């Protein structure tokens, strides 16, 4: 059956963990095979990122003038990377290397509102061009502004490491990161590493599954696991995961999943509204503050996406979860639109029923 909502496909175009992340805030983590030697730290010009994308997500609305990020290195060859906001001036990135200073400006006022805003700064030092944009995520109509200019500096890996490892004070910055990709990773379905997945040997934590493990599915019987994709992602802002509370979903334990993860719900209410015994709902659409919660307690999440070679429904502590990563395949259940989820949740008294 083709999903009702094409945006709710269980097959993401690419895995969210494959976005060439170099570093993420609040994490002593480097991806994409980037390593730093002692020489790189002492002589940062030996480790450079010439092209890439700096991304920062912010909790809106922003107050008046404030410093969003401020990295200062004053020993030897001085360097600065700072991000400022001002209601009138807009957003400013100040980048200093030695005696040279550049300012990249996104003139204000920037779009405000409530929710999450994303600042994107794309730089190409060899081509001597940069682009900066700010958007209010999920706004209707879309709210965004952009600017561009010339002569950006490359990023020094030693600075990136320090910026992303430093402790930050509480403020509007939800997370930030540097990637070699042209855009941040698309959000995609995933499950937490501790999710108990039903196998031929009983429940096994998702993070411990290995290729060849026989996964017990509700719609296609036993299937061998082809691959387990380990993902390291931001866990705040637009990437914040959803905590599905027991016993409303899992029988005995809470389940941590992506906001885009599809969860099966079965009951007379689903059949009454949609003439389907079971339907799939996006976890993010089920947030009600009681049975399903947005969880932003951690900065970075280690999660997994399972590849069974086809879309399938796996069981996690009594809750059926959709998985599948092959383009062109079809989910076995109808996927509800966001407004349909609201209707069903209201009929359920906003108490989600797990799939039996």
Predicted regions and their residues:
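Short, aromatic/His-centered strand-loop micro-motif at the edge of beta-sheets
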Residues: 96-118
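Long beta-strand-rich cores associated with HINT superfamily self-processing modules
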Residues: 192-199, 218, 222, 226-328
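Flexible glycan-contacting loops in extracellular carbohydrate-active proteins
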Residues: 143-168
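Glycan-recognition/cleft segments
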Residues: 69-95, 146-152
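Sequence-level preference for short, compositionally simple segments enriched
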Residues: 44, 52-56, 63-64, 96-98, ...
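Structural motif
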Residues: 207-214
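Short tryptophan-centered beta-strand motifs in secreted/extracellular beta-sheet-rich domains
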Residues: 115-123, 132-134
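A carbohydrate-recognition surface predominantly in extracellular/luminal proteins
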Residues: 16-67, 119
């Amino acid at each position: 059956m083709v999903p009702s909502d094409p945006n709710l496909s269980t097959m993401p175009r690419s895995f969210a963990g494959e976005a060439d992340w170099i570093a993420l805030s609040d994490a002593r983590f480097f991806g994409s095979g980037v390593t730093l030697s002692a020489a790189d730290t002492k002589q940062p010009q030996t480790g450079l990122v010439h092209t890439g994308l700096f991304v920062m997500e912010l909790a809106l609305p922003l107050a008046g003038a404030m410093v969003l990020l401020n990295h200062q290195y004053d020993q030897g060859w001085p360097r600065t990377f700072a991000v400022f906001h001002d209601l009138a001036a807009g957003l400013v990135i100040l980048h200093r290397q030695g005696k040279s200073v550049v300012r990249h400006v996104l003139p204000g006022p920037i779009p405000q509102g409530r929710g999450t805003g994303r600042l994107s700064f794309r730089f190409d030092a060899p081509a001597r061009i940069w682009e900066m944009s700010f958007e209010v995520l999920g706004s209707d109509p879309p709210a965004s502004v952009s600017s561009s200019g010339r002569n950006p500096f490359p990023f020094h890996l030693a600075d990136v490491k320090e910026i992303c490892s430093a402790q930050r004070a509480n403020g509007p910055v939800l997370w930030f990161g540097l990637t070699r990709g042209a855009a941040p990773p698309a959000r995609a379905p995933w499950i937490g590493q501790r999710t108990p997945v039903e196998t031929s040997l009983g429940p096994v934590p998702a993070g411990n599954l290995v290729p060849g493990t026989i996964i017990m599915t509700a719609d296609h019987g036993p299937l061998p696991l082809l691959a387990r994709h380990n993902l390291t992602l931001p866990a705040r802002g637009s990437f914040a995961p959803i905590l599905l509370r027991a016993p409303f979903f899992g029988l005995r334990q809470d389940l941590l999943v992506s906001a885009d993860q599809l969860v099966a719900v079965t009951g007379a209410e689903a059949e009454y509204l949609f003439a389907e015994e079971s339907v799939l709902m996006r976890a993010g659409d089920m947030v009600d503050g009681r049975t399903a919660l947005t969880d932003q307690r951690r900065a970075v999440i280690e999660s997994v996406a399972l590849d069974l070679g086809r879309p399938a429904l796996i069981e996690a502590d009594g809750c059926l979860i959709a998985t599948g990563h092959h383009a062109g395949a079809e989910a076995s259940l109808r996927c509800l639109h966001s407004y349909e989820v609201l209707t069903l949740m209201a009929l359920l008294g906003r108490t989600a029923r797990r799939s039996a």
